[in-house]
């Protein structure tokens, strides 16, 4: 970025939005190829390009915000509104899945046997792995808040410990979810129950992976002394996102696992 005599957000030309879009195209195409032709090459190519884009884009943002001082108060205000709008859009994204679930379950059609869960579907016990997953995510919400308070108080060591614990809990949740999927007595092909269950919980799982990655970057930055007690914008946004993921899971648990079973 050239020298500027104002505090406003002027973004340098960047290739990363384009490479990110190409990665998204390759991954969605790769997913279709994997489903129909059992080949994962295109999917792996998309994932590799996405990984490279993430690393380079994060590097640029860190350089601009931490080392060049471009994240002035007006810039932070704009980024804050951007994150609020992004999370709002995510709320509506998940609202569509809940709508589909309740539309199907509150008035089951004769094709489903007139009951919910549909005839022949054996739902998962909500008081086994799903309840453990709920406890894990709620605990991670506590640890991320602990990390935030430690950061604001200038307690570097505790912030690192709490953030490490949060990331580990995030990955533990993902492992439990993968195990649950592997052992589930129904598949995504099992009618409206299977599709609403796997799409809603699957997209939530994807958001947990994204949030865990976001927090892992924050952990690495905290270890590198990038955050101060006054300026830790990236961490705050990651914490917001993590709390959003927590709340979505509570709705999923109550709706799909507990009430829906």
UniProtKB/Swiss-Prot annotation:
GO CC terms, sorted: mitochondrial inner membrane; respiratory chain complex IV
Signal peptide segment: none
Cited SUPFAM superfamilies: Cytochrome c oxidase subunit III-like
Cellular localization per UniProt: Mitochondrion inner membrane
Pfam families (UniProt xref): COX3 (PF00510)
Ranges facing Mitochondrial intermembrane side: 35-40, 106-128, 184-190, 257-261
The keyword Signal appears for this protein: no
InterPro entries named among the record's database cross-references: Cyt_c/ubiquinol_Oxase_su3 (IPR024791), Cyt_c_oxase_su3_dom (IPR033945), Cyt_c_oxidase-like_su3 (IPR000298), Cyt_c_oxidase_su3-like_sf (IPR035973), Cyt_c_oxidase_su3_a-hlx (IPR013833)
Mitochondrial matrix side: 1-15, 67-72, 153-155, 224-232
Transmembrane region(s): 16-34, 41-66, 73-105, 129-152, 156-183, 191-223, 233-256
Membrane topology summary: Multi-pass membrane protein
Top-level taxonomic group: Eukaryota
Entries under PANTHER family matching the protein: CYTOCHROME C OXIDASE SUBUNIT 3, CYTOCHROME C OXIDASE SUBUNIT III
Purpose of the protein: Component of the cytochrome c oxidase, the last enzyme in the mitochondrial electron transport chain which drives oxidative phosphorylation. The respiratory chain contains 3 multisubunit complexes succinate dehydrogenase (complex II, CII), ubiquinol-cytochrome c oxidoreductase (cytochrome b-c1 complex, complex III, CIII) and cytochrome c oxidase (complex IV, CIV), that cooperate to transfer electrons derived from NADH and succinate to molecular oxygen, creating an electrochemical gradient over the inner membrane that drives transmembrane transport and the ATP synthase.
Family of the protein in this entry: Belongs to the cytochrome c oxidase subunit 3 family.
Protein name: Cytochrome c oxidase subunit 3
């Amino acid at each position: 970025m050239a020298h500027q005599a104002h505090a406003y957000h002027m973004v340098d030309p960047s290739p990363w939005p384009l490479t990110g879009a190409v990665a998204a195209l390759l991954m969605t195409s790769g997913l279709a190829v994997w489903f129909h032709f059992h080949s994962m090459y295109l999917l792996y190519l998309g994932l590799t390009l996405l990984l490279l884009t993430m690393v380079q884009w994060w590097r640029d943002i860190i350089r601009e915000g931490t080392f060049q001082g471009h994240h002035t108060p007006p810039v932070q205000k704009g980024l804050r509104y951007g994150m609020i709008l992004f999370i709002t859009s995510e709320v509506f994204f998940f609202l569509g899945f809940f709508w589909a679930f309740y539309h199907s379950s509150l008035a089951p059609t004769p094709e489903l046997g007139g009951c919910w869960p549909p005839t022949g579907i054996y739902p998962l016990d909500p008081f086994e792995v799903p309840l453990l997953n709920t406890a894990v995510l709620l605990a991670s919400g506590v640890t991320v808040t602990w990390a935030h308070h430690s950061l604001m108080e200038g307690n570097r060591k505790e912030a690192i410990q709490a953030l490490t614990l949060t990331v580990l809990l995030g990955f533990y949740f993902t492992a439990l979810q993968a195990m649950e999927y592997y052992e589930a007595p129904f598949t995504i092909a099992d009618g409206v129950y299977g599709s609403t269950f796997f799409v809603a919980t699957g997209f939530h799982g994807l958001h947990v992976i994204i949030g865990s990655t976001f927090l892992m970057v924050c952990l690495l930055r905290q270890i590198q002394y990038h955050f101060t007690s006054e300026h830790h914008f990236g961490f705050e946004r990651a914490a917001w996102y993590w709390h959003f993921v927590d709340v979505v899971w509570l709705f999923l648990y109550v709706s799909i696992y507990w009430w829906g079973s």
